[in-house]
Amino acid sequence: GSEMCIRDRNGAQKVYAVDVGYGQLDWKLRGDPRVVCMERTNARYLTHEQIPQELDFASVDVSFISLGLILPALDGLLSPEGEAVCLVKPQFEAGREKVGKKGVVRDPAVHLEVLEAFLRHAKENHFTVLGITYSPIRGPEGNIEYLGYLRHGQGTPGDFSLPEIVEASHSQLKD
């Protein structure tokens, strides 16, 4: 989905579609010469050997791994002013002891902790967080998820309040 949007709506010259799994990429995209399909590839270990040029943009939607483990690789791949949008999934960031039935994290305090950790990981890996919002679409099991907008390099962070974002997400996306 995000590959198609990046390719079609934003005029990307080349899209690297990275997935640790196999057979996930839409067949229309597989046949597109602008799309490089990198299946059975763990984004945590990506280097310039696999992706030789600096990237201007990255869309990150990972499962079963923390963004804190992905951002170091992204730091090495993005151009100096490159940007990224990361889907922050509390169920994969919070730690098992804070995840409820069916992998759902309902506690707003845990969501706040997750977003604070995301800010720390971003800064530690040379990113400025320009914005954070909640996704209007819940995850498959009903998790509230968040979108973080990053720019590579240190700069002035966006003007946002994590407690207000978490509160709004829980009031707007009630069960």
Q: Can you name each region flagged by the protein language model?
A:
Residues 68-83:
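A short glycine-rich, Lys/Arg-flanked "PGG" loop and its adjoining helix->strand segment in the class I
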Residues 111-125:
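Short alpha-helix
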Residues 14-65:
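S-adenosyl-L-methionine
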Residues 127-136:
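Conserved S-adenosyl-L-methionine
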